[in-house]
């Protein structure tokens, strides 16, 4: 008896209803024209890591917990004396999510993390880049349930970029709205 592989809830929803809805809305002829989620990039810039190397490692550990895969520590390429920054110092961390982990992260972001934000009124509908990608900033990474509020020493902000295969911002907005992204009216 063959076991069925796990498929994330949002992926099933995309295959069953979202794809057909977008095809009808934009009149696509080919199935491959329909926009889909490509990747999600999480980035955390740690300015305090210039003075303390352990902060970058702690942030990378927290980002790994949030993403479900190992975070990559990013290093400075050039020295900037104004910021007391030397070359090859840790300044942040990032993770790129694709496939199943991407859908799981978006599901947790929309349904768990964003409702926990204080005074949340919706996402800015103008944060598209012109090429079908959407970026949003999170002020505190402790809104994710994976991070224990009591054990977290500091709270850092993070950038979330959702990359899609959409050609225009309108197509990307329709795709993300179908995934229940809470855009402001």
Swiss-Prot record:
Signal peptide positions on this chain: none
Gene Ontology terms for molecular function: rRNA binding; structural constituent of ribosome; tRNA binding
Domain of life: Bacteria
UniProt KW keywords: Ribonucleoprotein, Ribosomal protein, RNA-binding, rRNA-binding, tRNA-binding
Pfam family, one: Ribosomal_L5_C
Cellular component GO terms, alphabetical: ribonucleoprotein complex; ribosome
Biological processes per GO annotation: translation
InterPro entries on file: Ribosomal_uL5, Ribosomal_uL5_bac-type, Ribosomal_uL5_C, Ribosomal_uL5_CS, Ribosomal_uL5_dom_sf, Ribosomal_uL5_N
Subunit structure as annotated in this protein's UniProt entry: Part of the 50S ribosomal subunit; part of the 5S rRNA/L5/L18/L25 subcomplex. Contacts the 5S rRNA and the P site tRNA. Forms a bridge to the 30S subunit in the 70S ribosome.
Its biological purpose: This is one of the proteins that bind and probably mediate the attachment of the 5S RNA into the large ribosomal subunit, where it forms part of the central protuberance. In the 70S ribosome it contacts protein S13 of the 30S subunit (bridge B1b), connecting the 2 subunits; this bridge is implicated in subunit movement. Contacts the P site tRNA; the 5S rRNA and some of its associated proteins might help stabilize positioning of ribosome-bound tRNAs.
Similarity remark: Belongs to the universal ribosomal protein uL5 family.
Name the record gives this protein: Large ribosomal subunit protein uL5
Lineage of source species: Bacteria, Pseudomonadati, Pseudomonadota, Alphaproteobacteria, Hyphomicrobiales
Gene: rplE
